[in-house]
Amino acid sequence: MKRIVILDYGLGNLRSVQKGLEHVGSSPAISGDPEEILAADGLILPGVGAFVDAMKCLDPIKGTIEEYARSGKPMLGICLGQQVLMSSSEEGKLTDGLDLISGKVLRFPKSELKVPHIGWNNIKIKQDHPLFEGIPDNSFVYFVHSFYVDTASENTLASCNYGLDFSASVVNSKGNVMGTQFHPEKSGAIGLKILKNFVDMC
């Protein structure tokens, strides 16, 4: 069986991601150990909280994550986990991300729409990629976030509109480092299919 590691770096709803992966037939490990990370067939970066805090927590294993990304093996960032993959974020103060995918994380502008963006919304698939194999365009998925990845990034896999268009999913140029702003583990059958697609990539 493919070994999937859910990265434990002090932030994130690890158990819900673990249950989602178990539902699609995987037996993921939860670990922050560099050796276990590098030995994994697939790596998931969950995340709930502030970008600055996440980067501080990731700092001791930043080099390990970068090495894993270079290996070509699949890696998936979820919610805040997607945001930390990017070049930078304006949350709090301008903070550098892991810069594994080019793009900026921005704050939703003040408008009549409530922030954070919480709930179900449809996504537009922009590129063919194994992560979205069998996922119909305009599928609904579940979001909880106050910051977004700018769709100016050519790395957008899928977009969503909440007052403005933003990147609901991103991918690096090699195709192995991916992110979803939405929570696949909370997105019903569609989300579980996306998790299954990730496992199948590993």
Swiss-Prot record:
Its EC number is 4.3.2.10, 3.5.1.2. Residues 3-202 form the Glutamine amidotransferase type-1 domain. Heterodimer of HisH and HisF. Disulfide bonds: none annotated. The keyword Zinc-finger does not apply. Pathway: Amino-acid biosynthesis; L-histidine biosynthesis; L-histidine from 5-phospho-alpha-D-ribose 1-diphosphate: step 5/9. GO terms for biological process: L-histidine biosynthetic process. PROSITE patterns: GATASE_TYPE_1 (PS51273). IGPS catalyzes the conversion of PRFAR and glutamine to IGP, AICAR and glutamate. The HisH subunit catalyzes the hydrolysis of glutamine to glutamate and ammonia as part of the synthesis of IGP and AICAR. The resulting ammonia molecule is channeled to the active site of HisF. This is Imidazole glycerol phosphate synthase subunit HisH. The keyword Endoplasmic reticulum does not apply. Coiled coil: none annotated.
